Amino acid sequence: FFNSRYRHQSYKNLMEAEKILREDGQFEESVTCFDYNSDGLKEYVCRMENYFAYISLISGAVQELEILKNTGNYCDNPSRVLEYDGSQEDYERGFFIDHFFTESQFEKYIKNEPAGDGVFSRIQYEEIKYSQSHHEVTLGAHAVWKPSNQKVFIRKKYIINSDGMYVQY
């Protein structure tokens, strides 16, 4: 949805439906793993008392985070599109997107200008460990950072609970 009004209304309606489903008092928090968005890859779906989120293997990031009382998706922040924004980014958006920047790229980034090559936002992370019972997901990714042609490995562990998510690198 490029029309943000429709997109926001859709998220709101989905969260209102989620609230109705939970009214029976039998809701149990869970972190499950399945192809949630029908892209052929598994996602980690976090249904907690106060929020709903999913973590994608593409970018290893949270692509949807909805606080139930606010009925909105906090990750609803699409990448810039040249036609509409006058500039374009080479990386995906979401929470806990991993970036490596040179000093000049970082200066651009903090000025809200397109920066970096976004390599970790576009690659597929792999599952290192998943514990449904402990509500933990550990992902890893290998990439080459272009400015120095240096091989980089990122490992991050999501710890999910009623209060939120913690990420350990």
Residue ranges of predicted features:
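Histidine-centered catalytic/metal-binding microenvironments
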Residues: F1-L57, A61-L65, N70-F96
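Buried hydrophobic-core signal for structured, non-transmembrane domains
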Residues: N50, V167-Y169
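Extended, loop-rich substrate-binding clefts of extracytoplasmic carbohydrate-active enzymes
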Residues: F100-M165
